[in-house]
């Protein structure tokens, strides 16, 4: 798996891959276990109110049970319920096909009034994703208390497949997409092969 983790983690000997994804074979489950890390306990994690913990637990469990999002792994980072790591499969028939993409979600103390910060751990080439992995997406900027984390991943997958350069960053990916779409697609495929299939 490409990119750099924001938390220091040790190899995990065993991983439970979500069973609702029929594309995930036994071999790919083993491959995921080779690159997903086990987080260390974090004594500095924020103390949650009972209401915050209930809401985060609900969102987390609903995401793990989703049958529409191609998620193969979902876990807390450093055993912190406000810091999640999610791995999902790229959409078939796109430049992301075959890739395993890591995203982290960071929930501040104003959640659920404001949405989480979403960042790709996997290195990406995309006009709506900054060099540091930060995702620029309307849904995250126009959050309301009825929005779900499942909605967030619908949005993330949709924006990968359908970039919105006018709402993105002034970066190389935006320039490439606007000037030569095929060249842009070729670069995305290269990134997928180099950073999202590492170890597979």
Name what the model sees in each region.
Residues 1-100, 106-200:
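UBC/E2-like fold recognition across ubiquitin and ubiquitin-like conjugation systems
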């Amino acid at each position: 798996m490409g990119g750099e983790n924001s938390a220091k983690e040790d190899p995990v000997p065993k991983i439970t891959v979500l069973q609702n994804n029929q594309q995930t074979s036994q071999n790919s489950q083993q491959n995921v276990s080779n690159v997903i890390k086990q987080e260390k306990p974090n004594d500095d994690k924020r103390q949650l109110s009972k209401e915050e913990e209930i809401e985060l637990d609900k969102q987390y469990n609903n995401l793990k049970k989703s049958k529409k999002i191609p998620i193969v792994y979902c876990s807390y980072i450093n055993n912190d319920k406000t810091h999640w790591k999610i791995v999902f499969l790229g959409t078939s028939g796109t430049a992301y096909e075959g890739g395993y993409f890591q995203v982290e979600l960071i929930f501040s103390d104003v959640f659920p009034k404001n949405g989480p910060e979403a960042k790709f751990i996997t290195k990406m080439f995309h006009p709506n994703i900054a060099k540091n992995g930060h995702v620029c997406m309307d849904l995250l900027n126009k959050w309301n208390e009825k929005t779900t984390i499942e909605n967030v991943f619908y949005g993330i997958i949709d924006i990968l497949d359908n970039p919105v350069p006018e709402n993105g960053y002034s970066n190389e990916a935006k320039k490439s997409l606007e000037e030569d779409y095929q060249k842009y697609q070729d670069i995305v495929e290269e990134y997928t092969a180099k950073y999202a299939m590492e170890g597979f």
